């Protein structure tokens, strides 16, 4: 019997070339892939939404979002992903299917999405202008402020989008995309941001 060895690779392993791209001068956009995260989809079972909400509050210390928002704790981000469902984004193995399942037994169905999605952070003073070319959502801070979230699409690709805390006074937008579409969306964002100048990198830190 042949032995197989499987290596976990980023879905952007080929597409991401760290460095500069596009216009010269000060870069208006920072495009970063976040790697090695834990992501669990939580979906309330039929008639159990209230029980799931109570379990989430007890487990995370905050209420899970019931509207399009992202809320954070010291070690996790809960992201609305649809009616009676949300995503748990974290690092370090504290919030995985195995560790969360006991608290939500009977109230929610859990699905590990850690290797099914790519996480892309778009930041900088031209981040909003870059994404505005690709999204039908109004990303102005008055309409899409810190903590706002949406299940939407960019370039005909379904994504989960939310705005993180500002970094150095600049907006930070986070995108979760299915791994099979990540490379295509990455190139689309690069093309959109090229006129602004882009710094490209990957990181182990959540944005």
Question: Locations of the language-model features?
Answer:
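Basic, glycine/lysine-rich polyanion-binding surfaces/domains
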Residues: 1-207
């Amino acid at each position: 019997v042949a032995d197989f060895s499987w290596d976990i690779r980023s879905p952007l392993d080929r597409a991401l070339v760290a460095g500069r791209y596009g216009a010269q001068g000060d870069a208006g956009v920072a495009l970063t892939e976040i790697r090695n995260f834990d992501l669990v989809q939580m979906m309330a079972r039929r008639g159990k939404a209230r029980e799931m909400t109570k379990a989430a509050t007890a487990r995370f210390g905050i209420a899970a979002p019931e509207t399009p928002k992202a809320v954070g704790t010291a070690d996790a981000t809960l992201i609305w992903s649809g009616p009676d469902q949300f995503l748990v984004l974290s690092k370090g193995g504290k919030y995985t299917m195995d560790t969360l399942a006991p608290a939500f037994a009977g109230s929610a169905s859990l699905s590990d999405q850690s290797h099914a999605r790519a996480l892309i952070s778009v930041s900088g003073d031209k981040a909003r202008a870059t994404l505005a070319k690709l999204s039908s959502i109004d990303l102005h801070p008055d309409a899409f402020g810190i903590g706002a979230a949406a299940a939407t699409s960019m370039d005909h690709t379904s994504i989960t989008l939310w705005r993180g805390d500002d970094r150095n006074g600049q907006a930070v937008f986070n995108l979760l995309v299915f791994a099979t579409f990540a490379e295509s969306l990455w190139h689309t964002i690069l093309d959109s941001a090229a006129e602004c100048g882009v710094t490209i990198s990957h990181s182990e830190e959540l944005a």
